[in-house]
Amino acid sequence: MAQVVATRSIQGSMLSPNGGSVSTRSEKLLKPASFAVKVLGNEAKRSGRVSVRSRRVVDTTVRSARVETEVIPVSPEDVPNREEQLERLLEMQQFGDTSVGMWSKPTVRRKTKIVCTVGPSTNTREMIWKLAEAGMNVARMNMSHGDHASHKKVIDLVKEYNAQTKDNTIAIMLDTKGPEVRSGDLPQPIMLDPGQEFTFTIERGVSTPSCVSVNYDDFVNDVEAGDMLLVDGGMMSFMVKSKTKDSVKCEVVDGGELKSRRHLNVRGKSATLPSITEKDWEDIKFGVENKVDFYAVSFVKDAQVVHELKKYLQNSGADIHVIVKIESADSIPNLHSIITASDGAMVARGDLGAELPIEEVPILQEEIINLCRSMGKAVIVATNMLESMIVHPTPTRAEVSDIAIAVREGADAVMLSGETAHGKFPLKAAGVMHTVALRTEATITSGEMPPNLGQAFKNHMSEMFAYHATMMSNTLGTSTVVFTRTGFMAILLSHYRPSGTIYAFTNEKKIQQRLALYQGVCPIYMEFTDDAEETFANALATLLKQGMVKKGEEIAIVQSGTQPIWRSQSTHNIQVRKV
């Protein structure tokens, strides 16, 4: 039986001057300005006056709040005066000034998730804890580097963090190496100049100033005279001039410093290698044994690869979601079937920009995001997002815009690679990503749903309830509480993008960690009782205790999905309650 319940009429909630929902929405819109107001406000306190610039920050935010809430009539009591607003903003602490105990607050406020690659710069207990404070939602292990022992250490540390922290959880992603073509080891980097001749050979162990080996036996067969060979996605480039049975002779087009084990691409071509190599299968087995949450599968060319991997996981009894990395020219014609077979996609722009004309990458990024959203799949934007912060403490303005564009286009998550794996400023990079995503989200109009989303789900009753719960959240300015054992309803709600946070309560630790990837979802572990009302009350008490909601705030409660929890009482249930 389907049931929709409200503690008071929806119309009353919209019109009541004491409902509090409008002021709550105003506060949420005001929060992103806290950094500017805090900095400027401190100057004002020292000088004994409020600066004109800080007034402008508040004025702009107030105008944004008015635009957002024009649909709902309000009385003067609903909107605090400017002095109260300024005082509240000055009292708010900027993220990073607080201790670990305050981590839940920025998590609730920021919807776009952050994937951080853990490497030599961050693979200690202290750094993983600090990355979590800085905003990391998913810890990624790049299997192209390191060994199983080093990755096991990171997995154990993340699991330790999850066990010790009640108000946050970090998911674990294992990124397969895939069929990469790489140059061999060099005793020291080789400096190459434009016009110079250079040779790549399939003979192992060659490393001279004019020739280096590659790790792929069919390399010679895959290239032809006139092909453009790119190193590390275009940091260096070579024109193929001729080839023999075991070597490829090139002319340096864009020079630079060639280091050991550099990634090689041929523009417009993909290597004729299987998408999942023998090493990948070893790494996948390692992931099963250590119960990771996600596989990011490199260089997926067709859906068959995904089906093969999922069959293996099913036979192994492993509940691990598969994220396909779109980074091969061969994957573009099969994009729809690949994403359909998967649980999500990663826009891996580095290799994608090497195999395709670079000007196509932003167009493909938007298309892949839109396709994933219309199909109800998670989508991650990756590669070079804050590349300059590997060596510099501040990002370029273009990088900041890049993050904002990904957030505005609707990505579930944005990813840091070398920035946190081996960069000099991993915590600052994560902090920049958090701040930019948070500020961008404050400017996005709620209620923008992807077209054809309903066609992606077979459970039409759950769809309907997710849609109406989203409408309720957007109309009343409320957050949403959902109870789930499988994560299905929380993921479905996430793709509808309600304006408020989705608090997903689950009694499964595995589901809690998985939901850490999805936009707008704050996963919380809680044991469910046999009584729905008691569980609802416990959930609201938890949110109140953690400071995630305020007393008197309205919350939409959803209980629906593929495996209803309290089947005897109601299969599908939406309520609006006051905390």
From Swiss-Prot:
Tissue-level expression: Mostly expressed in seeds, and, to a lower extent, in roots, leaves (veins and trichomes), inflorescences, siliques, pollen (grains and tubes) and flowers (sepals and petals).
Gene3D superfamilies: Phosphoenolpyruvate-binding domains, PK beta-barrel domain-like, Pyruvate kinase, C-terminal domain
pH influence on activity: Optimum pH is 7.8-8.0.
Organelle targeting peptide span: 1-63
Segments for region (Disordered): 6-26
InterPro entries reported for this sequence: Pyr_Knase, Pyrv/PenolPyrv_kinase-like_dom, Pyrv_kinase-like_dom_sf, Pyrv_Knase-like_insert_dom_sf, Pyrv_Knase_AS, Pyrv_Knase_brl, Pyrv_Knase_C, Pyrv_Knase_C_sf
Pathway the protein contributes to: Carbohydrate degradation; glycolysis; pyruvate from D-glyceraldehyde 3-phosphate: step 5/5
Cellular compartment(s): Plastid, Chloroplast stroma; Mitochondrion
Principal location: plastid
Annotated positions binding K(+): 142, 144, 175-176
Residues the entry annotates as binding Mg(2+): 327, 351
Domain of life, source organism: Eukaryota
A matching Pfam family: PK
Cellular component terms (Gene Ontology): chloroplast; chloroplast stroma; mitochondrion
Substrates-to-products reaction catalysed: pyruvate + ATP = phosphoenolpyruvate + ADP + H(+)
Site-annotated residues for Transition state stabilizer: 325
GO molecular function per UniProt: ATP binding; kinase activity; magnesium ion binding; potassium ion binding; pyruvate kinase activity
Role: Required for plastidial pyruvate kinase activity. Involved in seed oil accumulation, embryo development and seed storage compounds mobilization upon germination.
NCBIfam families assigned: PRK05826.1, pyruv_kin
Membership in a protein family: Belongs to the pyruvate kinase family.
Protein's name in the database: Plastidial pyruvate kinase 2
Species of provenance: Arabidopsis thaliana
Gene expressing this chain: PKP2
